[in-house]
Structures are given as C-alpha cells and as structure tokens.
C-alpha cells in the first residue's frame, strides 16, 4: 500500500536538496532566457496528479487499453481548448515536445530526401528547421533562407529559392528572430510552387493567443508549438491545423502515434488543458501585452548605452545583442551576467565570426521576468544593470553590486508569492 505522506525530503535527501536549490535559484535569479517561463501552481498540480499512472495509447474514444474514460475527458478538454484558442479545427495535444511535434509533421508530409526550405539557424532559425546536426538536416535536403541587411526576413530571397529548388515544404518560425513574420506572404510563396507551409510558432504562441502577434493558423497547412515558453504551460508540444483536410489530420495523428510516440503523458496533457484555459483569461492578454512592452523598453536602454541590437529593435518578446563591436563573446557575457544572478543565453548573431559554442551575442527575452510582475520601470533598471556588467565584465565589484540589486528586486517580485 502506498501512503500519501510519503515524501522525497525524508526518502531521498540528495535529490531533495537539488530540487530545493533549483527552487531558490529560480526565486533569486532574474530569468531572461527567451524560451523559459514560470508555469502556474495549477499546471504543476495537474502534472503531479495520478494521471501519471495511466497508459492511454491511441486517441479519445479509440484507445488500445481499457480504463481510459476519464483520461479521454482530460485529453478532449485540451484538444477543444487548443482549437478554440488558436482558431483551428484540428489539434493534437500528445507530442511530448516541440521537436517531436515537428518530427511528426515531417513524417506526415514528407519522404526522406525531400527538399525543405527553412530559416538558417545562424540567422534565427531552429535546430529542427534543417540544422545538419538534427534529424531534419540528416533526413531531408535543406535549403536555408535568411534575413536581409536590416535584419528582417528576406522574402524576395525566399521566393527566389523556392522557385529555384521547388521544395515540398517551406518552414516558417524561429528561435531568435525579433520581427513580425508575414505568414500570408509565406503562404503565397508556398502556393506559387505547390509546397506545404508549415509554421513552428513555439516562441510566440502566447503572444498569438492574446492577439499581440499575427496568428499563422489561418495561413499555414500545419502549425506546431510548444506549450511552455510564452504560453507558460507545461513542457510539451502541440499540432494545429485548419481547413478541413481530414486526410491530412489522419496523417498527422498517425505520425504522432504510432509513428513517433507510444503512450501519451496524460498528466502533462492535463497541464496543457489548464494552461490553455488560463490563456483564455483576460489577465493573460494583459500579461502578453506587457511582455511586448517590456522587451521594447529593454531595447531602448541597450541602444542608449551604445549596444547593437540585431534589426535595431523588437516586435515580439525577444531580441539579440550583437557584441562584436564590444569585443565580447556571448560566452563571456552569459557567464558574467550569470555571476550577477541574471540568466541569459549566448547566441549566434548574423555573420558571427565565432563558433556556436562561443558566439558573439546574447539572446534576451521578457516572458519570465514579466511573469514576476516587472513592468517598464523595472526592466529598464534591469537593462541598465546588465550594461553595467557588460561594460565592466572583469570587475567583480561591479558584478557583486548588481547581484545585490538583483536579489533585492527578486525579493520584491517573487515568482511564487
């Protein structure tokens, strides 16, 4: 018999210590990694539920195991909410991650060796959009498109490459691009050569749900997203589509199960259902609007302090600092800011002379810090502290002074009050 009073602290002190230290780290560090966020206690309650015990291979009403009547309700809630939130008529909530959702789309729509047009990783794309180290770059013939001198997506180049290479699929979406994507233009280019348009909206899904960023669902044949990042749910993936192509929907379902995955994680799907409901609340829209405002406010400070921002600004939740002119590497900046309890990630910038393991830039995002309650005044102050560190990257006294300020503001704006 399992007793409800069983706990990790009494049973596994070593593991519990690491968990507690991570809890403290999240409270005492300012999180600026663009792909990270804080999920709600309600989501964590779902993820820690007895739903974790249930195997449920298949889909609601079509399971391979018995005893699925209640997990069917859970999954259907998540499906219905995803469709409502993003204006889709198809949703698959089973992918364990965004990468696995993307893998399922490739599997459903392509054959190995097919040509795919995807955004260059070095210019803002994602590993799963054709990087040679990823399955996408190994299994398919990838033709990369990029950005122009202003830092915006070069649609003329995209159209030219599409006409020349005749890809079977064009991928929209990014991991480090601060502009607004013209989904309609991308669909126009795809239609001109009879290609699929697949959009990975993982980074901006929360902004899209709140109407702060254009929705690709009406334009793309298929859309994927993660359920964390700006959506602030559990770590997982989601596939969406619109247009009533039932054959496509069957292919997508089969590509997730049984092709890519076995049993779905029902406790995570419950967490997704909670997060999707939270994203329908009025306060979620206010939050996402503030995410965008905060990113713009931070950019203003960096520009005024003489730092180069790729594309000169941001139209979403993230931006890149190009540190080439400062003779700093992204690795150095990441480490110095980390010592001041400010977490960012090193990131390649356009025409980066450094390797991806060193880089010449850092990526900064506002979703997590906004979740704490920071508004323009706080993020401007924060950006100023970051400039102080980067201006004096080898001065431990400066870094320590900033760390004290960070600890103070973190105490005033806790993640979980």
From Swiss-Prot:
Coiled coil: none annotated. Gene3D superfamilies: Aspartate Aminotransferase, domain 1, Type I PLP-dependent aspartate aminotransferase-like (Major domain). The keyword Amino-acid biosynthesis applies. SUPFAM superfamilies: PLP-dependent transferases. GO terms for biological process: glycine biosynthetic process from serine; tetrahydrofolate interconversion. It is an enzyme of class 2 (transferase). Its EC number is 2.1.2.1. GO terms for molecular function: glycine hydroxymethyltransferase activity; pyridoxal phosphate binding. The modification N6-(pyridoxal phosphate)lysine is found at residue 229. Pathway: One-carbon metabolism; tetrahydrofolate interconversion; Amino-acid biosynthesis; glycine biosynthesis; glycine from L-serine: step 1/1. GO terms for cellular component: cytosol. Keywords: Amino-acid biosynthesis, Cytoplasm, One-carbon metabolism, Pyridoxal phosphate, Transferase. The record marks 228 as: Plays an important role in substrate specificity. The keyword Chloroplast does not apply. It catalyses: (6R)-5,10-methylene-5,6,7,8-tetrahydrofolate + glycine + H2O = (6S)-5,6,7,8-tetrahydrofolate + L-serine. Its cofactor is pyridoxal 5'-phosphate. (6S)-5,6,7,8-tetrahydrofolate binds at residues 121, 125-127, 355-357. It holds the Pfam family SHMT. It is found in: Cytoplasm. HAMAP family: SHMT. Catalyzes the reversible interconversion of serine and glycine with tetrahydrofolate (THF) serving as the one-carbon carrier. This reaction serves as the major source of one-carbon groups required for the biosynthesis of purines, thymidylate, methionine, and other important biomolecules. Also exhibits THF-independent aldolase activity toward beta-hydroxyamino acids, producing glycine and aldehydes, via a retro-aldol mechanism. Homodimer. Belongs to the SHMT family. This is Serine hydroxymethyltransferase.
């Amino acid at each position: 018999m399992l007793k409800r009073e069983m706990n990790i602290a009494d049973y596994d002190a070593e593991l519990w210590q690491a968990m507690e230290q991570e809890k403290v780290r999240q409270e005492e560090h300012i999180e600026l990694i663009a792909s990270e966020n804080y999920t709600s206690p309600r989501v964590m309650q779902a993820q820690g539920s007895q739903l974790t015990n249930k195997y449920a291979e298949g889909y609601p009403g079509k399971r391979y195991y018995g005893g699925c009547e209640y997990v069917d309700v859970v999954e259907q809630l998540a499906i219905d909410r995803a469709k409502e939130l993003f204006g889709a008529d198809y949703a698959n909530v089973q992918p364990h991650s965004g990468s696995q959702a993307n893998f399922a789309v490739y599997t459903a729509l392509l054959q190995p060796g097919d040509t795919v047009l995807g955004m260059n990783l070095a210019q803002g794309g994602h590993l799963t959009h054709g990087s040679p180290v990823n399955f996408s770059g190994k299994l398919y013939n990838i033709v990369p498109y990029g950005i122009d001198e202003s830092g915006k997506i070069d649609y003329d180049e995209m159209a030219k490459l599409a006409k020349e290479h005749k890809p079977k699929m064009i991928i929209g979406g990014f991991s480090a691009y601060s502009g607004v994507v013209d989904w309609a233009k991308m669909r126009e280019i795809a239609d001109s050569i009879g290609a699929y348009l697949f959009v990975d909206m993982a980074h901006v899904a929360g902004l899209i749900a709140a109407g702060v960023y254009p929705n690709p669902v009406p334009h793309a044949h298929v859309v994927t997203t993660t359920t964390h990042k700006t959506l602030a749910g559990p770590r997982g993936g989601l596939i969406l589509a619109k247009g009533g192509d039932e054959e496509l929907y069957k292919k997508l379902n089969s590509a997730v199960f049984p092709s890519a995955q076995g049993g779905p994680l029902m406790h995570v799907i419950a967490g997704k259902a909670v997060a999707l409901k939270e994203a329908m609340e009025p306060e979620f829209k206010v939050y996402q609007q503030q995410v965008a405002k905060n990113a713009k406010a931070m950019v203003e400070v960096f520009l005024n302090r003489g730092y180069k921002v790729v594309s000169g600004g941001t139209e979403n939740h993230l931006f890149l600092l190009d540190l080439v002119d400062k003779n700093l590497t992204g690795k150095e900046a990441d480490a110095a800011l980390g010592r001041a309890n400010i977490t960012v990630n090193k990131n390649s910038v356009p025409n980066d002379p450094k390797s991806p393991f060193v880089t010449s830039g850092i990526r900064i995002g506002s979703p997590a810090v906004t979740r704490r309650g920071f508004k323009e005044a706080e993020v401007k102050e924060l950006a100023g502290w970051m400039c102080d560190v980067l201006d004096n990257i080898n001065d431990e006294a400066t870094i320590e002074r900033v760390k004290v300020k960070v600890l103070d503001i973190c105490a005033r704006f806790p993640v979980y009050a």
